[in-house]
Amino acid sequence: MFVGKYKDFPKIDMTQSGAKGAVKQVVVGPEQGWEDYVLRVITLDVDGYSPTHTHDWPHINYVISGTGVVMISGQEYPVEQGTCAYVPSNEEHCFINKGDVPLELICIVPLRGEA
């Protein structure tokens, strides 16, 4: 069992090529007893974005706060607090903060997707 606040977890700069103003926090994973998946919180600063990329696993996202877009295979979808997004395997994607406050979102991936 595990109970905690995501704000208490260390922030890790996302330094991949194509990222700007992006950090992640690994909140739930094997250390908390979830062996097969990882729940991360991604924060994008104003004008920040995650790298455009693809991979062979899907992921699920939920927007905690802020506004922006998720790009999936060249299609732009607006996101705001309360928006869910499912990104299928092998679809090119990224998140972009289009608002005037940080964009915070939950990102759930299989364990192999946490690098």
Predicted feature locations:
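A short, N-terminal "cap"/entry segment at the start of jelly-roll beta-barrel domains
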Residues: M1-D36
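Conserved short histidine dyad/triad with adjacent acidic residue
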Residues: R40-H55, S89
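Well-ordered beta-strand scaffold positions
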Residues: I42, T67, Q75-Y77
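A generic "binding-loop/recognition-motif" signal
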Residues: G48, D56, Q75, E91-E92, ...
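Histidine-centered metal-chelating micro-motifs
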Residues: Y49-P51, V69, A85, S89-F95
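Glycine- and acidic-residue-biased ligand/ion/polar-headgroup-sensing regions
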Residues: P58-G68, S73
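Short acidic-glycine-tyrosine-enriched beta hairpin
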Residues: Q75-S89
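Ligand-binding loop in jelly-roll beta-barrel domains
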Residues: S89-E114
